[in-house]
Curated annotation (Swiss-Prot):
The keyword Manganese does not apply. It holds the Pfam family GcpE. The gene is ispG. Pathway: Isoprenoid biosynthesis; isopentenyl diphosphate biosynthesis via DXP pathway; isopentenyl diphosphate from 1-deoxy-D-xylulose 5-phosphate: step 5/6. InterPro entries: Dihydropteroate_synth-like_sf, IspG_bac, IspG_bac-typ, NO2/SO3_Rdtase_4Fe4S_sf. The keyword Oxidoreductase applies. Binds 1 [4Fe-4S] cluster. [4Fe-4S] cluster binds at C268, C271, C303, E310. It comes from the Bacteria. This is 4-hydroxy-3-methylbut-2-en-1-yl diphosphate synthase (flavodoxin). It comes from Exiguobacterium sp. (strain ATCC BAA-1283 / AT1b). It catalyses: (2E)-4-hydroxy-3-methylbut-2-enyl diphosphate + oxidized [flavodoxin] + H2O + 2 H(+) = 2-C-methyl-D-erythritol 2,4-cyclic diphosphate + reduced [flavodoxin]. SUPFAM superfamilies: Dihydropteroate synthetase-like, Nitrite and sulphite reductase 4Fe-4S domain-like. GO terms for biological process: isopentenyl diphosphate biosynthetic process, methylerythritol 4-phosphate pathway; terpenoid biosynthetic process.
Length: 373
């Protein structure tokens, strides 16, 4: 997708062990729903998010109790930790000192210049970035009065205002988000922001709703934005278990070929030719590949006549027939299997291919590490 090349023009920003922006992959982020001061509950939820494929996690820091818990949380998780700060610069300083990987603030809301400068200097000293988070629902009064209501222009001007505060202090290690619950507004804001800034953009449709409707709304909004090559990190915001946010985000990225470390399932919608219980098989396989973290495409198809040819791009697949199934790789049949065991045989093939790809990835990573040394 040539439009995706836009992302290579953004300035790379390090967040923990990840490089965000530049020509790097789009990163999946989520946010905990626990009380941050409850370390056990927060770590447990983050571990679940990690397992689902979350790559960066954000926690709220509304008070001293939350700030006091950050170091312990950070020491017990494996992905970069981002902390959400509003208004109180002392909480930001404490979060930075605790070793978090990024903070999310709006400098204009922190207070006097010396307070902002203290936060910026602390972030510089630790080498961590700051995310400026503009939200249509909390746009500053000056921009609401100028435009009459939340607009893309007002949102980008708000971001420019906060960016200037940081740049005037010599700080450029910045990520920007411009979230709205209205898909068209978000699309317009991110499109304008991509033309205005060279900083990485964190994209999302905020307050998108419960699981079903929110997933569709997020997919529509994120899909439109990502199709323009805009976005270095993504979050799906749902009124549900945050693990579901990660699942939806992975599926959106996979749809655009932007998920380097995720398995994809393709399956047919069924018709009168079907001789197997394809729907239940597809659900079982989808669940099985959920936590496979390599780029593998799996097909589950109901028609043995057309199935293999229709899914020739799949790494591995199965096509059902009466009392049997055909296992195929890249459209070529490798063997017939009895219907009773075809799902288990498919899983074995999936595991073998995943192991091959994982080993190949590890070799490539080792070669890169050797070159850098």
């Amino acid at each position: 997708m040539s439009e995706i090349l836009h992302r290579s023009l953004t300035r790379p920003v390090r967040v923990g062990n990840l490089i965000i922006g530049g020509s790097n992959e789009v990163i999946i982020q989520s946010m905990t729903t626990t009380k941050t001061h409850d370390v056990e509950a927060t770590v447990a939820e983050i571990k679940r998010l990690e397992e689902a494929g979350c790559q960066v996690v954000r926690v709220a820091c509304p008070d001293e109790r939350a700030a006091d818990a950050l170091a312990e949380i950070k020491s017990r998780i494996n992905i970069p930790l981002v902390v959400d700060i509003h208004f109180d610069y002392k909480l930001a300083l404490k979060a930075i000192e605790s070793g978090v990987d990024k903070i999310r603030i709006n400098p204009g809301n922190i207070g006097r210049r010396e307070k902002v400068e203290a936060v910026v200097n602390a972030a510089k000293a630790k080498g961590i970035p700051i995310r400026i988070g503009v939200n249509a629902g909390s746009l500053e009064k000056q921009f609401l009065e100028k435009y009459g209501y939340p607009t893309a222009q007002g949102m980008v001007e708000s971001a420019m205002h906060h960016v200037k505060i940081l740049e005037d202090l010599g700080f450029y290690n910045t990520i920007i988000s411009l979230k709205a619950s209205d898909v068209n507004l978000a699309l317009e804001a991110y499109t304008l922001a991509a033309k205005t800034f060279d900083y990485p953009l964190h994209v999302g449709i905020t307050e998108s709703g419960p699981l079903f409707s929110g997933s569709l709304k997020s997919a529509a909004g994120l899909g439109a934005i990502l199709s323009l090559g805009i976005g270095s990190t993504v979050r799906v915001s749902l009124s549900d278990d945050p693990v579901e946010e990660v699942k939806v985000a992975k599926e959106v990225l996979k749809s655009f070929g932007l998920a380097a470390n995720a398995a994809t399932l393709i399956s047919c919608p069924t018709c009168g030719r079907i001789e197997i219980d394809l729907i239940s098989i597809a659900k079982e396989v989808e669940e099985y590949i959920q936590n496979i973290n390599v780029n593998i495409k799996v097909a589950v198809l109901g028609c043995a006549v057309n199935g293999p040819g229709e899914a020739r791009e799949a790494d591995i697949g199965i096509a059902g027939a009466r009392n049997e199934g055909l296992l195929f790789r890249h459209g070529k049949i490798i063997r017939k299997v009895p219907e009773a065991t075809m799902v288990e045989e498919l899983k074995k093939e999936i595991d073998a291919i995943a192991a091959e790809k994982m080993a190949e990835r590890e070799r490539e990573e080792q070669e890169l590490a050797n070159q850098s040394n």
